[in-house]
């Protein structure tokens, strides 16, 4: 909605950092919105102008009230509307006429309820846009500016110390989850800069607030709860911008299941997009996508506290031999790499440990920490100094408070003395044990993220490590041939589709489109038997099902016989269908069959698909979704992640296949999709890949083109 410029920034500041506030619907009734907002502002010591509006009460809590919005002075920065939904539109109109710069609307009953509510919300949008007013909501819990102590919400908000330069901002469409996530973050002493509940986003959405806060100098992590993306492509652009600014985006996006997407649409009044496409593209844009509120808090905690990202595997220290085995299973499950000790690290640990503790990763220190206070200071450098370790997790038993008070101070002393730059995490093995020891707060102050369980710690660490190792792997060349700029709209035939692939440099079998059997014989003799015949029509996408494909033709007589049979089969399946012709192609050599596809998601844009291909593609479902702008090297890595990746690399004596040629095809399909948004779908199935150095060929292909607008 709002462009990123100085004027826009000033507008948003009137909402996020108001110097004057009008509380419309101020109240003395305990628990009411108007009373709760007023209590928050007084408890926070808000020092700006505060105007109370209540036509029925001349005084509230010793402060005089105005009888109406019309009595406000002109140019108030922000109006907080604690009024019923039926009064909201008139209140916003009155605020606009008084030059109020921004407003927060708590009331529900707008677009999330149906046509009438949507019409009322559209009226709100029109008034705000006409008068240049910034508006948060409706159907939201408001905004808390922790940096300046301005809680514009009815949720009880205790003041907190300023976050400094490494805080987290909560941006959530859901007001309830904004409040819950905030409580959970404060429980783990995560410093907060802002908590913003956007609700129905009639005027300002998550993207607007995100754009305003990128580069703010105080927010290191954006913890996002987004039920529906209204501007997906803009969101991805902002994600790239935030990453360049050294800020991190952690996203919780409900909607993996169909039922969840429908529920979210009902809740927010927006249309659900494709979840898998979203995950693929936002991850590529540099967003850490999590699956639960716990993960949202846990990943945020690591990013806020760590001096640097974990760019390698992890070392685990524990006090239990049994947990050592459990840790190996857990790390395998969450895909957290546990490198073996190097000879140097093993030697250093042998020197630091008593003889009965063998060096390993995970390292079982037994109960030695109780009798050897210097143990952690001696052992931690062995892994912190190794490049193969990007992080350390201390898994400590807290069951017995007496022994815990003996163990924790030496750990604090070790971290304080070593001042590690790499992330060090603390995880209690016993989630039911007390978790309020003062030493844990000391560890947090030293940059150690503390967790109530190893699973939460390691799952979050795996997310952050995967993100850190991702890097920028975007292909920067989207340009394709100008000859492709005028494509026919609709579903293209295989022959037409292959002509486009040829212009993109993708290999296809030798062949030609013919209109009669004699011409077919001439072409077959030119390219050499064996050949294949394929019926061609945009109205016949599944030609094999209609008998429109004849394979393995080795002679002129077989071709003539096949020609007749093909036409009879197609007419039986689709009476009256006129073919564009028959494609005569040289029979492709056998190889591994893959599928390479792409589709233009209406919300997110192009996304690619790779996987096992051929007639069993849908049954096997060995596929991966990719962004359309990966580099060749990144595509090869993705191909190796497929179940058929072992066949590409060479399996049980079979030769390695030309994975580089497949990556080239995927790269070119991605460039085509990015350059030509009118292409809605591409499918190459099968793409046959041959031995290394022998390339890959598209044996069948279909392209769909949108109607020109």
Task: Give short role names for the model-derived ranges.
Residues 1-709:
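Catalytic-core regions of core metabolic enzymes
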């Amino acid at each position: 909605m709002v462009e990123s410029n100085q004027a826009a920034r000033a507008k948003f500041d009137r909402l996020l950092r108001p110097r004057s506030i009008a509380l419309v619907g101020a109240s003395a009734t305990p628990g009411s919105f108007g009373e709760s907002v007023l209590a928050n502002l007084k408890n926070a010591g808000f020092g700006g102008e505060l105007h109370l509006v209540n036509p029925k009460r001349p005084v509230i809590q010793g402060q005089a009230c105005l009888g109406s919005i019309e009595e406000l002075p002109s140019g108030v920065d922000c109006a907080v509307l604690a009024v019923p939904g039926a009064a909201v539109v008139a209140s916003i109109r009155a605020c606009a006429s008084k030059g109020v710069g921004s407003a927060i609307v708590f009331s529900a009953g707008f677009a999330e309820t149906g046509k009438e509510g949507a019409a009322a919300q559209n009226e709100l949008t029109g008034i705000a846009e006409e008068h240049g007013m910034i508006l948060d909501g409706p159907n939201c819990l408001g905004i808390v500016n922790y940096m300046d102590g301005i809680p514009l919400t009815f949720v009880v908000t205790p003041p907190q110390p300023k976050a400094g330069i490494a805080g987290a901002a909560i941006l959530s469409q859901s007001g309830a989850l904004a409040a819950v996530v905030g409580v959970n973050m404060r429980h783990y002493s995560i410093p907060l800069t802002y908590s913003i509940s956007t609700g129905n986003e009639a005027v300002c959405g998550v993207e607007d607030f995100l754009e305003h806060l990128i580069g703010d100098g105080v927010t290191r992590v954006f913890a996002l709860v987004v039920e529906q993306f209204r501007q997906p492509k803009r969101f991805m652009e902002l994600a790239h911008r935030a990453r360049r600014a050294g800020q991190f985006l952690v996203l919780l996006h409900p909607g993996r299941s169909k039922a969840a997407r429908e529920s979210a649409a009902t809740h927010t009044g927006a249309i659900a997009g494709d979840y898998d496409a979203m995950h693929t593209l936002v991850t590529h844009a540099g967003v850490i996508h999590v699956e639960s509120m716990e993960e949202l808090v846990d990943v945020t905690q690591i990013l806020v506290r760590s001096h640097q990202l974990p760019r390698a595997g992890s070392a685990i220290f524990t006090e239990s031999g049994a947990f050592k085995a459990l840790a190996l299973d857990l790390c395998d499950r969450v895909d957290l790499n546990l490198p073996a000790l190097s000879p140097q690290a093993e030697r250093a640990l042998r020197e630091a440990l008593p003889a009965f503790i063998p060096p390993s990763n995970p390292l079982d220190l037994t109960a030695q920490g109780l009798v050897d206070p210097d143990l952690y200071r001696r052992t931690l450098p062995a892994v912190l100094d190794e490049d193969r370790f990007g992080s350390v997790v201390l898994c400590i038993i807290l069951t017995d408070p007496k022994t815990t008070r003996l163990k924790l101070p030496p750990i604090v002393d070790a971290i304080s003395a070593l001042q590690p730059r790499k992330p060090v995490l603390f995880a209690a093995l016993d989630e039911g044990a007390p978790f309020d020891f003062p030493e844990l707060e000391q560890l947090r102050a030293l940059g150690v993220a503390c967790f109530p369980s190893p699973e939460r710690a390691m799952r979050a660490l795996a997310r952050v490590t995967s993100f850190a190792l991702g890097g920028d792997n975007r292909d920067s060349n989207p340009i394709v041939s100008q000859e492709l700029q005028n494509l026919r709209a609709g579903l293209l035939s295989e022959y037409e589709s292959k002509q486009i692939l040829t212009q993109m440099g993708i290999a296809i079998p030798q062949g030609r489109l013919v209109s009669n059997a004699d011409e077919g014989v001439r072409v077959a003799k030119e390219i050499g038997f064996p050949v294949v015949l394929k019926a061609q029509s945009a109205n016949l996408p599944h030609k094999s099902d209609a008998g429109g494909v004849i394979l393995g033709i080795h002679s002129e007589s077989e071709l003539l016989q096949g020609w007749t049979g093909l036409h009879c089969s197609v007419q039986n399946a689709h009476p009256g269908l006129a073919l564009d012709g028959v494609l005569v192609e040289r029979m492709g050599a056998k190889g591994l069959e893959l599928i390479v596809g792409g589709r233009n998601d209406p919300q997110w844009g192009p996304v690619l698909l790779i996987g096992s291909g051929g007639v069993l593609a849908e049954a096997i479902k060995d596929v991966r979704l990719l962004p359309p702008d990966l580099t060749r090297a990144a595509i090869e890595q993705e191909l190796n992640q497929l179940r058929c990746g072992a066949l590409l690399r060479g399996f049980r004596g079979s030769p390695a296949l030309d994975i580089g040629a497949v990556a080239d095809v995927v790269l070119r399909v991605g460039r085509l999709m990015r350059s030509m948004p009118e292409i809605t779908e591409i499918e190459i199935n099968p793409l046959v890949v041959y031995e290394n150095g022998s390339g890959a060929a598209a044996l069948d292909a279909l392209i769909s083109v949108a109607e020109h607008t």
